[in-house]
């Protein structure tokens, strides 16, 4: 089956996930435009179009989203942790809400949002910010033509993000115990390769249902393979 060539607008394209995703999309023949801050274009992979704007303010870039059919929101606090509540409030929440507004104003058909696995016993403020964006996405899908895919990883293991590997034996044990099995699956680790594969799949195969977003939890993300 011949895949349709997608026109993808990405916020957060210079980050841990963004650069690799752009490379993967370009290699598969898709058109990619990335939002960057002033002076940030040097960190983008070659071959990508870019515009300068503020990811926290939809009015700074919404007019540049068209003719994209897909908007991918990847902006967030680097290396999120329990002590970064203020950053989640100032960056993760407004950037997510701005992406929804930009998608609507740009008449994008499909919004792809990377949220976080939930519920969880820690990272409450991070989950709160991401959940608020999910709520806004559901509202937008219910009131417009917009479709959405929400991916909920817990931790993406890859270059510079590998410390949770030491927890793998504990995850293996937790998956075997009935009372911890569901939580271990929901809060499991995914690799950087799996995350990029899942994002590419989501972009290339948008949902048909316009009544609400589809949600991919950790087990579904883990099925992703490098393009």
Show which residues each predicted segment covers:
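NAD(P)H-binding glycine-rich loop region in Rossmannoid oxidoreductase-like domains
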Residues: 40-98, 102-105, 203
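N-terminal Rossmann NAD(P)H-binding glycine-rich loop of SDR-like oxidoreductase domains
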Residues: 4-28
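Conserved Rossmann-fold NAD(P)-dependent oxidoreductase catalytic core, especially the SDR/UDP-sugar
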Residues: 31, 39, 77-135, 140-149
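Substrate-positioning beta->alpha
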Residues: 91, 95-96, 165, 186-201
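Flexible, glycine-rich beta-alpha linker
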Residues: 149-178
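Structural motif
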Residues: 7, 69-70, 110
């Amino acid at each position: 089956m011949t895949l349709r060539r997608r026109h993808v607008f990405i916020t957060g394209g210079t980050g841990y996930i963004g650069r690799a995703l752009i490379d993967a999309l370009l290699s598969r023949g898709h058109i990619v435009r990335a939002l960057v801050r002033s002076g940030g274009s040097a960190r983008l992979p070659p071959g990508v179009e870019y515009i300068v704007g503020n990811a926290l303010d939809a009015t700074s870039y919404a007019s540049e989203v068209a003719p994209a059919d897909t908007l991918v929101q990847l902006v967030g606090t680097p290396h999120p942790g329990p002590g970064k509540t203020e950053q989640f409030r100032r960056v993760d929440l407004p950037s997510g809400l701005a992406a929804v507004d930009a998608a609507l104003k740009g008449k994008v058909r499909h919004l792809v949002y990377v949220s976080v696995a939930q519920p969880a016993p820690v990272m409450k403020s991070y989950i709160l910010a991401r959940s608020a964006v999910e709520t806004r996405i559901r509202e937008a899908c219910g009131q417009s033509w917009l479709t959405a895919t929400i991916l909920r990883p817990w931790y993406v293991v890859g270059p510079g993000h590998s410390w949770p590997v030491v927890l793998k034996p504990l995850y293996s044990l937790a998956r075997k115990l009935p009372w911890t099995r569901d939580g271990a699956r929901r809060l499991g680790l995914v690799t950087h390769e799996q995350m990029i594969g899942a994002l590419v799949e989501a972009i290339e195969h948008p949902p048909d249902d316009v009544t609400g977003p589809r949600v991919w939890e950790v087990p579904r993300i883990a099925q992703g393979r490098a393009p």
